[in-house]
């Protein structure tokens, strides 16, 4: 019998500085948004609004919006969840299946419901207190992925709720919603001594390898773009940026990208330190090829899951 969720690891052996470069890139660039823009529309449960919003913010949404991973990572798309639930004598609890899930196209603000796996019925979120006919508990809330711009256009698309109530409750809380992009990394990634390791969760209802490919393709593209945009100051070293003096052959390392790339070509550098190094040894295109080969190796290793 296949389990709905399994914990696995993907391990590839790489040159240590390249493994560190990929790990740091993953942790800094692969940002899956949390549901931190939450609005409680009605609540007669025993849990206060803050408890509901905290629980909803950290719903593991990647396993629900798995068909849209690349566009969510590029922020072309966002998402929202909506819950309207009343306690009954028969149903005294709430699972993740009780939510409705919607993808948001940020160009058009269109809101489209997505299918939800029946396995979400196994993930409990809340248990109501003992049912009483005259005091049935209810909860209605909506939460948007971080970075979603709430405006009249997108609110007009929320045809499944009372817009007047939404506007009132949103105006009550919008000043305390964190304006920064709030996110988590999809996986834990480590790279001790070049052993690049991804600790992943695999679910039975979708193709994890396809999702991983979307993530790695995004990461590779973002890293290559960063490499092309990266610059090292040439001239006197002033200890504010990574810089290289061709006359003395001294390199001052002040950022992780410079450190990892020069170490790949034989330097033994550390952050905020000077090193005598011949920068003509650095071949950016060779490093990019090694990066692309490493990404292929990661995807190949995932085929063994």
UniProtKB/Swiss-Prot annotation:
EC number assigned by the record: 2.7.7.6
A Pfam family of this chain: Pox_RNA_pol_35
GO biological process: viral transcription
Presence of keyword Ribosomal protein: no
Any one GO cellular component localisation term in the record: virion component
Enzyme class: transferase
Family per similarity comment: Belongs to the poxviridae DNA-directed RNA polymerase 35 kDa subunit family.
Record's protein name: DNA-directed RNA polymerase 35 kDa subunit
Species in which this protein is naturally found: Vaccinia virus (strain Western Reserve)
Gene name of the record: OPG156
